[in-house]
Swiss-Prot record:
Keywords: Acetylation, Cytoplasm, Methylation, Phosphoprotein, Repeat, RNA-binding, Ubl conjugation. It is found in: Cytoplasm. This is RNA-binding protein Musashi homolog 2. RNA binding protein that regulates the expression of target mRNAs at the translation level. May play a role in the proliferation and maintenance of stem cells in the central nervous system. The modification Phosphoserine is found at S6. SMART domains: RRM. Phosphorylated. Ubiquitinated by the RHOBTB2-CUL3-RBX1 ubiquitin ligase complex. Residues 276-289 have a biased composition (Low complexity). Residues 1-15 have a biased composition (Polar residues). The modification N-acetylmethionine is found at M1. It comes from Mus musculus. Induction: Up-regulated in astrocytes after brain injury. GO terms for cellular component: cytoplasm; cytosol; intracellular membrane-bounded organelle.
Length: 346
């Protein structure tokens, strides 16, 4: 994609990538040129750079551009005006933010997520089971504050990272005659890059947590970055425009499509290797492949955020993968508290 700048500008989107005076201008008319864009915004302050993004093949405007003011205070003036119209079309100026580096998945850690625990399993059972692999520093189950019953999942912290590798290589373990799933715990920032939650509030509660955190690991930060209908420009940038309708400039957000198709079931998408229908609470039927149905909601990020829970858990969630059996008897809403194995930290 090309950027056509007005006279006296470089026309490069990278020249001022860290400039607080840079703004993203969306909703431009196809007839709007860099000159007319500059003329309009010059009333708010001196403009150092102005450009309209164009398709490299057709040379037609893509309906958006950038304006960089010499004084960042001019940005506040623009935002202070509730309505902007250029070439008989309402436009939408927003602040342009440099895209943050994507957090990397943790490959070495001492903490694991354990999901699918039976209702009668207690924290001592979990600790005792995993001690056969190595010394356990900490073990905890996540509890529902209202019912005071655990939600079927928790965390175990080992003394040695190599033990985690061994435990997760086995992946499925049997505790109290119930198959449970073990995965490396990931920092919350990895699963929910900055900005994804803020742009997801229009989605259902479970959709927010699942689609933006675990169901779309192949598309991290897909809402927070600049590619929301404007692919291929200024690769070092992310542009945030809260309240800006996604469908106005590009395809409908993938999460909304998934919601329309009903692909989320109890916070888990239906997986080809596991049964999709939800099971009634407490029924815990057998599933294809020999695994009984799980009773826990699994790793949903919102379950680890409340202030009431243990500080050692709040920054971790499990990496995404389906539990053996997608039907869960418990709902996922509701605050959680953690009960921890006493080791000097709790």
């Amino acid at each position: 994609m090309e950027a056509n700048g007005s006279p006296g500008t470089s026309g490069s989107a990278n020249d001022s990538q860290h400039d607080p005076g840079k703004m993203f201008i969306g909703g431009l008319s196809w007839q709007t040129s860099p000159d007319s864009l500059r003329d309009y915004f010059s009333k708010f302050g001196e403009i150092r750079e102005c450009m309209v993004m164009r398709d490299p093949t057709t040379k037609r405007s893509r309906g958006f551009g950038f304006v960089t003011f010499a004084d960042p205070a001019s940005v506040d003036k623009v935002l202070g005006q509730p309505h902007h119209e250029l070439d008989s079309k309402t436009i939408d100026p927003k602040v342009a933010f440099p895209r943050r580096a994507q957090p990397k998945m943790v490959t070495r850690t001492k903490k694991i997520f354990v999901g699918g625990l039976s209702a009668n399993t207690v924290v001592e059972d979990v600790k005792q089971y995993f001690e056969q692999f190595g010394k356990v520093e900490d073990a905890m189950l996540m509890f529902d504050k209202t019912t005071n019953r655990h939600r079927g999942f928790g965390f175990v912290t080992f003394e040695n990272e190599d033990v985690v590798e061994k435990v997760c290589e086995i992946h499925f373990h049997e505790i109290n005659n119930k198959m449970v799933e073990c995965k490396k715990a990931q920092p919350k920032e990895v699963m929910f890059p900055p900005g994804t939650r803020g742009r997801a509030r229009g989605l259902p509660y479970t959709m927010d947590a699942f689609m933006l955190g675990m169901g779309m690991l192949g598309y991290p930060n897909f809402v927070a970055t600049y590619g929301r209908g404007y692919p291929g420009f200024a690769p070092s940038y992310g542009y945030q425009f809260p309240g800006f309708p996604a469908a106005a400039y590009g395809p409908v957000a993938a999460a909304a499509v998934a919601a329309a198709r009903g692909s989320v079931l109890n916070s888990y998408s239906a997986q080809p290797n596991f049964g999709a229908p939800a099971s009634p609470a407490g029924s815990n039927p057998a599933r294809p492949g020999g695994f009984p149905g799980a009773n826990s909601p699994g790793p949903v990020a919102d379950l680890y955020g409340p202030a009431s829970q243990d500080s050692g858990v709040g920054n971790y969630i499990s990496a995404a993968s389906p539990q053996p059996g997608s039907g869960f008897g418990h709902g996922i809403a509701g605050p959680l508290i953690a009960t921890a194995f006493t080791n000097g930290y709790h």
